[in-house]
């Protein structure tokens, strides 16, 4: 009796184990099929591999009010909200102690962050590849040949060609619109910063007449050099942002 009891329990355990293995295998097969179908769909419409959003964009706290900003908005924030701060603070990027002109320190010593931010933004954009464009061209050619050979009606051929064209245009517009909007916002913020820099660093004739008389020759020369450095940096930043790959 005891042996029969243990044999029955062993057989039940084996059946339960086999059932669990079958269920796990079915689940793994379904998951692999769904993943392959998703990849096939992306390949069909020609999307390049897009890096996942696991890389978080670095935020830098304002050392005066402790608000978090990315590097571009931080510069605009310092220019607009804290243009005349003179207390010693730590640079949010390198932790160096800066007594004044924190904005100048960031833009001159950490200008590479602007380019890194732009490259990271471009990597996140999914753009149809050349393979997608070639597939779209072949689809249009096949549809056109079908219409010429009479394998499909004129209306169906026209609708198929229109659908292929619309899908390509839609994919381009949907994927580029978000990056274009973000680029426009960044360029607008950069233009504001540039405008304020030029207003602050390029003195007018009235300013020269009223203020230069109270400054020494060395101080006036130092301010001119700083203005030239800022102007050169702004020009380099704009050119690298617009044309650098």
Curated annotation (Swiss-Prot):
Pfam families attached to this UniProt entry: Di19_C, zf-Di19
InterPro entries according to UniProt: DI19, Di19_C, Di19_Zn-bd
Taxonomy, superkingdom: Eukaryota
Cysteines joined through disulfide linkages: none
Family that this chain belongs to: Belongs to the Di19 family.
Protein name as annotated: Protein DEHYDRATION-INDUCED 19 homolog 4
Species classification: Eukaryota, Viridiplantae, Streptophyta, Embryophyta, Tracheophyta
């Amino acid at each position: 009796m005891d042996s029969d009891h243990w044999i029955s329990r062993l057989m039940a355990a084996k059946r339960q184990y086999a059932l669990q293995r079958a269920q796990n295998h079915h689940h793994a097969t379904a998951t692999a099929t769904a993943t392959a179908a998703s990849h096939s769909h992306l390949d069909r419409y020609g999307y390049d591999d897009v890096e996942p959003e696991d890389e978080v964009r670095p935020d830098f706290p304002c050392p005066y009010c402790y608000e978090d900003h990315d590097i571009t908005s931080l510069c605009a924030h310092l220019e607009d909200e804290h243009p005349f701060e003179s207390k010693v603070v730590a640079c949010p990027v390198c932790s160096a102690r800066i007594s004044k002109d924190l904005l100048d320190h960031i833009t001159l010593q950490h200008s590479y962050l602007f380019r890194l931010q732009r490259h990271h933004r471009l990597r996140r954009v999914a753009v149809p590849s050349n393979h997608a464009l070639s597939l779209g061209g072949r689809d249009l050619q096949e549809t056109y040949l079908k219409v010429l050979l009479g394998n499909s009606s004129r209306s169906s051929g026209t609708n198929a060609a229109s659908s292929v064209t619309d899908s390509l245009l839609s994919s381009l517009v949907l994927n580029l619109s978000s990056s274009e909007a973000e680029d426009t916002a960044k360029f607008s913020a950069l233009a504001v910063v540039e405008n304020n820099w030029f207003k602050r660093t390029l003195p007018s004739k009235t300013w020269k007449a009223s203020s230069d008389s109270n400054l020494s020759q060395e101080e006036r020369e130092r301010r001119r050099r700083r203005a030239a450095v800022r102007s050169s940096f702004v020009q380099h930043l704009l050119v690298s942002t617009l044309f650098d790959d």
